[in-house]
Amino acid sequence: MEDSTDVFYRHLQLNEVMVTGVTGDTKLKHSTAPISVVTGKELRGTASTNVIDAVAKQPGMAQVTTGGGISKPIIRGLGYNRIVVMNEGVRQEGQQWGDEHGVEVDGNGVGSVEILKGPASLMYGSDAMAGVLILRSAPAPLEGEVRANASTEYQTNNGLFAYSLNGAGNHGGFVWDARFSDKRAHAYKNKYDGYVPGSQFRERAGRLMLGLNKRWGHSQLTWTAFHLTPSIVEGERDEETGELEWATDHHKTYSKTLPFQQVKHYKAVWDNLFYLPKGSLKAIVGYQQNRRQEFEESADDYEVFFKLHTLTYDVRYLTQEFGGWKVAAGVNGMWQKSQNLGEEALIPEYRLFDVGGYATVSKDWERWTLNSGVRYDRRHLKYDHTKNFDGVTGSVGAVWNACKSLNVRMNVARGFRAPNMSELGSDGVHEGTVRYELGSASLKPEYSWQADLGVDFSSKYVEAQVAFFANRISNYIFAKRIDRVMEEGYRTYEYTQGDARLLGFEAGVDVHPMHRLHLGSTFSYVDARQLNEPEETRYLPFTPAPRWTAEVKYELTHRGKWLNNAYVAVGMECHLRQNHYYKADETETATPSYTLFNLSVGTDLMVCGRKVAELYVMADNLLNRSYQDHLSRLKYTDVNAATGRMGVYNMGRNVVMKMVVPLVFEKR
């Protein structure tokens, strides 16, 4: 669909897209859960430094940033261990409680993204309270196909240079896919801070998949390796000039400078699908090893070394449809072992085992789809203490296809999340948040009730969506600042709990007044509050500001001799002032509003009726606006003594150039 030569009708096809973030393959228009789909073409046409950055502008999405290339996903105001990221069919486990490293996935290998909002799906268990981000690889080639492509990218602000090489094939049902990617960037700059020391990074990744695709199903083995070496932005300034302090005279160096990290993530996944007489059986086993080292005083000696082993398992059975009914049942979970091999440790060593079982049932009528299910989870955690957490969750939802153009979705879901090791046992400086953190062994599990109501409208000239949600969380865990100095130069934060309520909505409209012209706009809003609290502690910390986006896109050519799907687009991104913040003990501050303008052009290059390349040029923050995002962790670093401004600002103007070239395409 995404490479169609006539993208004018793309909005009419979206409701027919098959999504898999629910219990089985389901058309988007029949999904009771709120799901967004981002295609590979859309990902390639977005200016970003990583895959989370690429989807962060979707309605209801946001990101916590720490430096130049580090992003953590936020869905409807919730993130970290409240979101499950799925990649290669297994949940990504990379110590996601930390701010100083992102999701260890090569964005070049992501073929599409499904964003599941809320705890409406029961397949993922604890930690999926806010939703699920499913990063899907491109599908295997068809029988007899061999394909290869090369892509390259350059960004002007931080000198980011990246390339990726990929080859894949299918011969007699034997499938293979191999990829290598490399990316490097020097420090980014903005109008107030100049070049920001410690924001440079280097990323390398590899992937190999071998498997069999047969009439009985498939069996595939996948190996991935991901290496990220980011320096750490400390934000320290000269007391007289207010300028950021550098450890080197070369502000555009691609080399790592102290302090820096080394993050290495390895993964092996065995994915099996078997078609049975009355259904299908899916079985996936995965092993991951995450290694995170921090180097502070010497490039040869690490002070911090976290090593995390994770074994995941997932078995589920899905019946064939009978009389409009579908039934699914499954068992999944994981085993973990975390080791501290450095001199310093923020969290204690621990071992974890969890298991969960679920069952769902759905029924399709001519205009109605009903879906419901129940799940039980149990988690055992052993560190300095022994903890056991368990919870029962469930959901019930319906979709009413009122007519060909109008769908109405309703869903009520119960969510559950056990406290993570950082919340229970932290005791040290967390470089990603630039603060000293203290855990609390007395924390209880979080439970939530969330209700969703959505309306989708699609016609030849207009596509519109609006989705409302209300989320009530008991025992919501967050870090608040306390008046205690544990280490000089760092504020001290302690994890605590309260009852929370989140209300919000996402709305979007795409108008096509003429064949080539698209006028699009979205708005996202979430109000996150603690219940029965005074003004200073009323709002939950680090809640995304209301955001309005608008875009005018004109498609220049369709089926041209040399250019195909050529377009030019002008976009606006307005973040409103965030006055809803946690005021107690100066945990956070208000964030002023700001507006960014963007410009992009793109096209497919054609030779003899065949696509030979995709070209994209994008300019982000076109007017070079100086701003701080409310979710930037660098907002709370040192004050500039010369100007009185606190913290480090986000990236200034950035022009991005991308090219994707298919090297080989054969069919025998």
Enumerate the predicted regions with their spans.
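Periplasm-facing N-terminal accessory domains of Gram-negative outer-membrane beta-barrel systems
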Residues: 1-16, 76
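Outer-membrane beta-barrel proteins, especially TonB-dependent receptors
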Residues: 11-13, 21-46, 65-73, 77-78, ...
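Active-site-adjacent helical/loop segments in soluble small-molecule enzymes
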Residues: 55
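A short linear hydrophobic-aromatic micro-motif
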Residues: 60-64
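Localized edge beta-strand/strand-to-loop motifs within extracellular or lumenal beta-rich domains
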Residues: 603-604
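Gly/Thr-rich phosphate-binding loop signature of adenosyl cofactor/nucleotide-binding cores
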Residues: 619-621
